[in-house]
Amino acid sequence: MLLGAFYDLGVPKKVIEQPLIDLGLKDLYQLDFKESKSCSIRGIKTKVENIDCSPIKRTWKSIKELILNGHLEDKLKTIIYGVFESLAIAEGKVHGIKSDDVHFHEIGAIDSLVDIIGVCAALNYLNPKRVYCNEPTLGKGFVQTEHGKLSVPAPAVIELVRQKNIKFLSDWNSIEGELSTPTGIALLANLVDYLEPPSKYSINSYGVGIGLSLIHI
């Protein structure tokens, strides 16, 4: 959703894909942005098709080497590294293993690599002075993962909000489902300056991203 919103805001597709090309990932996916509607509201839906036939599951160690050895500008490299490192530390903590040994089942998949790297590239391109975000709602219920059925918020989300001291909305009457993923919280932790809206602001432009899930309120 966030990547689609950035594209809708005007970030060129070339900007989003360039760091993926620089990291040697271009032949592993097909990225498309499509005008769509959800509840009659228009926006952009992002589709990442995985054409990576490799059975190898990436670890944080291999992703770290890919980022550090990649031909990226220093600022962007630091941002991308920070997001993945946060995820690795959190996943390592909840699974009781070293962060380097974490197998990224969900975020190691090529679609998640495209999503994380693309979002970081888009924000780097926009170069805002400050980034604001409302406190996240984590959700409730259960979610199906590579490790089986887990309660919501997922253990990695709990560890990330603890690790990064992220304040969140504790509404026990919140909508059923996973409203904040580990990837989303890691992006928030590394890209957002303030977890509250500014007291006064005006809107010059905005983007709308449409997700894959329909939440029933």
Where are these regions (language model features)?
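Active-site histidine-anchored catalytic micro-motif
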Residues: S112-V119, V131-K167
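Divalent metal-coordination and catalytic microenvironments
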Residues: T46, D111, L188
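Alpha-helical support elements that line or immediately flank enzyme active sites
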Residues: L2-K13, G118-L126
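Conserved small/polar residues in nucleotide/adenosyl-binding loops
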Residues: I215-I217
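Glycine/serine-rich anion-binding loops at beta->alpha junctions
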Residues: M1-L2, V102-A121
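Glycine-rich nucleotide/cofactor/substrate-binding loop typically near the N-terminus or early
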Residues: D8-H95, A154-V157, R162-D171, I175-I185, ...
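Acidic, glycine-rich active-site loops and adjacent beta-strand->loop/helix elements
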Residues: L23, K37, G108-I110, E135-Q144, ...
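General beta-strand structural signal in soluble alpha/beta enzymes
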Residues: S99-E106, Y132-E135, S170, I203-S205
